[in-house]
Structures are given as structure tokens and as C-alpha cells.
């Protein structure tokens, strides 16, 4: 979580971000228990109030207009802080394996021209999520480059090529701001991106989901168990096919 005065926000809420148009966008974070948190949006001057619960967590939703901007979003627990250069448009998650991970700078066709032209797409914004694992949904994420970035030759070079070209085509056709969130991991299985609840509905995965629930929270501890299980499996396979 990123410190904003006494208010803490997840790392995905930063300057230059894009919010989904014509929707109720959820904001959440932490503050002192019982503290009132007010969010004010510059597109309509409206304020939304909520209060932190006993554990300090708060959440509320704000209504967004049709595509436009730039705007500011002010979050205050008594000391206001602004998120600046905020756009409203279309937000897409770019997820997948290594084909989604391939960067624009990884020698895509006409790479030099594409990088040069990227400076002209400043209403495309980029958010790059770092890889991490968790057996349960997280309230925060690790992000690269401090959060959302304005599209430019420098910033897009390290971004997903598939994601960027999709976003550029969307921007050209709809003429609205586009926010692209890269969250991909080469070689991962579809099951790794699926909730435990959804997998438990499939008989084949039911026992496996129950096993995951018994694993320790520490990533390092889970990795040790994985290595031990893998070694045991290899030992069994060696007996079958030495």
C-alpha cells in the first residue's frame, strides 16, 4: 500500500491512471480506524464518503462519466491528496503466458517505427504488475515504475507487445483513452489464474483445492513443499521407468 497522508491506497491508484467509463469504480485502502475518508472527483465535483472499519479498511465506489479527461481524484482523511492526470475510458487487463509477455522492444516488426509513433499516443496509459503468487485474492499488488505511465517510446518498450498493439487499435477505433494493465507470466497454467471456488466446482480439482487450503501462507514455504513433492514424484517415476 502506498502512503497518502494517513490514507493508504493500493499501488494501482496513481497519477496517470485510467478509470473505466460509465461505471461504478471501486476505491479501497486503509486509514485510522473510524476515520472518515472522502473521495472527490473533478469531472462532476461530487464527493463520496466512507469510514474505515475497526481494522482500518475502507472501500467505496465512484460513478464515472463517458470517456474524457484529464481529471483529478482527491482522497482526503482531513489532509487532501490529489491523483492527477486521470483519464476515463476503456480499461483492459493483458494477461497470459510468454506470448503476452513479449515486449515491444523484443524486435517486433517495424519496431523502431512503432516506438517512435508511441509518443503520439499519450491517451494510452500503461500499468505493469510484477509477478507474485498467493492462494487468496490480494488487496494490493506490486507494480513496476511506480504505477501508471503515459505511453511513450521509452515506456512502451518494456510493455507487452500484444497488449500495446491491441490497445492502440482500440484507441484508434473508439477514440477514447485506453488503460492497459499487463499481468502475465510465461508458462503458467490456466488453473493458476482461476479462483479456488471455481476450480472446486470441477471434480478433478476438488481434492487439489482442499490441499492448497492447508498450505502455509509463506511463498517460500509453499515453494519448499513443491520441490519436495516434485522430488517424490520423480522418485516414483524412476521406479516405473528407470
Question: Where does each model-flagged region fall?
Answer:
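Cell-envelope and extracellular/periplasmic
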Residues: 4-242
